[in-house]
């Protein structure tokens, strides 16, 4: 029996999909701006 693939971890979540990480790259900033334009309440993890 294999284990579940999703093992929740808030620190890992923030480090891989967080706002600071998104702002680091040009593509990441594009993601944030798209989500802002769409009117998302949560921009990043």
Swiss-Prot record:
PROSITE patterns: RIBOSOMAL_L34. Keywords: Ribonucleoprotein, Ribosomal protein. InterPro entries: Ribosomal_bL34, Ribosomal_bL34_CS. The keyword Nucleotide-binding does not apply. GO terms for biological process: translation. NCBIfam families: rpmH_bact. This is Large ribosomal subunit protein bL34. The gene is rpmH.
